[in-house]
Amino acid sequence: MTIAQVRDELGAAIGEYWDNRAQTYSNGIQSELAGYGRCTWQRVLAHAIESTCDAVAREGRTMRALDLGCGPGFFSILLADEGCAVDAVDMSAKMLERARANAAQAVPGASIAFHQCDAADLPFASESFDVAVSRNLTWLMRDPEAAYAEWLRVLRPGGKLLVFDANWYRYLVDDDVDAARRSDQANAQVYDKGSRATDDEERRCELIAAELPLTSVVRPQWDIQVLERLGATRVSVNEQAWQDLWSADEQAYYGSSPLFMIEARK
């Protein structure tokens, strides 16, 4: 089997997994939108794209934003709230169904176009977007360096890339992280069952993660090196982002894989 065939097979498994998770994942997004998450993430997003918004406004046009791996539409909604014309992509048809429904409820009439595609193979012309955002996506990339190159391709010169992610599933290759995870998650009641994966779904995701390249690297150091090698500028990272952005329950449950935030310019 060729490398391309292996990646295609893995991609199909990833798509099937997230189709199955669409409803429970959407439940979590709806909770965020209704509570702690929306204003907290909105504040961080608004601050991160403020200078880009100002520059676009001076040009007299609407800012174009790309939501990469949009899932049930959380960032699509926040970007629309910031006045952006949003394109949102996801490989899961069922996630896109939930995203459309959530957006229709949260930001009726907003300019959001949803597209089913691989986030590493985008159907957009080069230099199309002023900002591109992803959350909990990069770890899933079968060729993450190529994905970063693709995301930079579709950004306009001076455009901004925001990446929120964590060392998800590193516990599969690191015994210390695994011990910390088991301790954090000993009390499973701390996190809402209605938005969590089932035990069977979690095992399936572990099998997927075991085949993904970023499971075994140290991040965000890897990301910084790759982005700079690809020509991104003003690359910075906030490794304490989880303290500002996660709820107390998320911090308790996922503390062994803390969320980081990467900012970069094209």
Residue ranges and their predicted role:
Residues T2-G60, F75-L78, K160-T198, A241:
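Conserved class I S-adenosyl-L-methionine
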Residues P213-G231:
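Short alpha-helix
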Residues R64-D121:
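Class I SAM-dependent methyltransferase SAM/SAH-binding core
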Residues A232-D244:
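Conserved S-adenosyl-L-methionine
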Residues V131-D143:
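A short SAM/SAH-binding and catalytic strip from SAM-dependent methyltransferases
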Residues A120-V131:
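A short acidic, Gly/Pro-enriched loop at the edge of an enzyme's catalytic core
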Residues E145-P157:
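A short glycine-rich, Lys/Arg-flanked "PGG" loop and its adjoining helix->strand segment in the class I
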